[in-house]
Swiss-Prot record:
Protein name as catalogued: Tripartite motif-containing protein 44
Domain of life: Eukaryota
Originating species: Mus musculus
Modified residues (Phosphoserine): S338, S341
Zinc finger intervals, B box-type: 176-217
Pfam families listed in its UniProt record: zf-B_box
CDD domains: Bbox1_TRIM44, Bbox2_TRIM44
Acidic residues bias (residue ranges): 89-167, 332-346
Residue ranges crossing the lipid bilayer per the database entry: none
Function (record text): May play a role in the process of differentiation and maturation of neuronal cells. May regulate the activity of TRIM17. Is a negative regulator of PAX6 expression.
Subunit structure: Interacts (via coiled coil) with TRIM17 (via coiled coil).
UniProt keyword annotations, A-Z: Coiled coil, Metal-binding, Phosphoprotein, Zinc, Zinc-finger
């Protein structure tokens, strides 16, 4: 068979491409088999080497003889061929062992590098997680501080707003201002009958109410309360009767009826305004009376406290004087027994 292969190789010299690949897609030959004479690329050379362990592969050189015929010589040639085959097989096995050891070393080094990279990645991830947790804790603490500050500022703002815009405080301030005379700043303790207004004690003396008829708060309150409040009721009854009479007159036009209604309601509105003013006067007078009453009570309490303070001061002075008078007597008593003892000794 070797002779047949050699004859084929002599008839068909190698063209420099891989004999196993497709002719149209065959790459350049890199190795050649010395036993069978075929040229191979890198991939097919490795496959041929693994399949035929006894074949000898060498680097392909263009123009060189690809096939080396076996030496003829009968029985003498057989040992040489066996030795050559054994050497080739040993070389192939050694090459395969070296390749396997290299692949094992490479795989071990790759595994070690992968484990190192994994450990580094894990440490990096842990450090990143720790840093993220620290950042989150810091952000939470900052947010809590900001919330506390905002709550305090809001509470302060609410208290300030309540103190500034509390309607009860404003109403109380208005009441206090109404209880004082706008001209003199004194309590409103007198009532002007002509102007129907509360005034202080200085208004009829040096103010705008000089020469006016005055009355006390109690008198003004009783007078306003005793007045008949049936004026509004009488005005309403009179309005209804006039409207009936006017509407029954066929000579009255619609425009005249509108004018009449407006005039009558103006009269009723005036009566209502008078009643409203009367009620407001009653409230103001009653409030002024309460203020005056409270003022009188406070004045009585203050005078009583002044009397008590005076009595306490007098009692303290008497106690001090009695203590001062008692001190010389005690000194005389102490000197008396000592002088008597001295006389007895003499």
């Amino acid at each position: 068979m070797a002779s047949g292969v050699g004859a084929a190789c002599e008839e068909l010299p190698p063209d420099g491409t891989c004999d196993e690949c497709e002719p149209d897609e065959a790459p350049g030959a890199e190795e050649v088999c010395r036993d069978c004479g075929f040229c191979y690329c890198r991939r097919h050379a490795d496959a041929h080497r693994q399949k035929f362990l006894s074949h000898r592969l060498a680097a392909y050189v263009h123009g060189a003889q690809a096939w080396t015929p076996p030496a003829s010589g009968g029985d003498d040639a057989l040992p040489e061929d066996a030795e050559a085959k054994g050497e080739a097989e040993g070389e192939v096995e050694s090459e395969v062992g070296e390749e396997e050891s290299e692949t094992e070393v490479d795989s071990e080094s790759e595994e070690e590098s992968e484990t190192e990279e994994d450990s580094e990645d894990e440490s990096d991830e842990e450090s990143e997680e720790d840093s993220e947790e620290e950042m989150e804790d810091e952000q939470e603490s900052e947010a809590e501080e900001d919330n506390q500050e905002e709550g305090e500022s809001e509470a302060e703002g609410e208290t300030e707003a309540e103190s500034e815009f509390d309607p009860e405080i404003e109403m109380e301030a208005e009441r206090v201002a109404k209880r004082k005379c706008p001209d003199h700043g004194l309590d409103l303790s007198t009532y002007c009958q002509e102007d129907r207004q509360l005034i202080c004690v200085l208004c009829p003396v040096i103010g705008a109410h000089r020469g006016h008829q005055l009355s006390t708060l109690d008198e003004a309150f009783e007078e306003l309360r005793s007045k008949d409040s049936g004026g509004l009721k009488a005005a309403m009854i009179e309005l209804v009767e006039r409207l009936k009479f006017k509407s029954s007159d066929p000579k009255v036009t619609r425009d005249q009826m509108k004018i009449f209604i407006q005039q009558e309601f103006k009269k009723v509105q005036k009566v209502i305004a008078d009643e409203e003013q009367k009620a407001l006067h009653l409230v103001d007078i009653q409030e002024a009376m309460a203020t005056a009453h409270v003022t009188e009570i406070l004045a009585d309490i203050q005078s009583h406290m002044d009397r008590l303070m005076t009595q306490m001061a007098q009692a303290k002075e008497q106690l001090d004087t009695s203590n001062e008078s008692a001190e010389p007597k005690a000194e005389g008593d102490e000197e008396g027994p000592s002088g008597a003892s001295e006389e007895e000794d003499t």
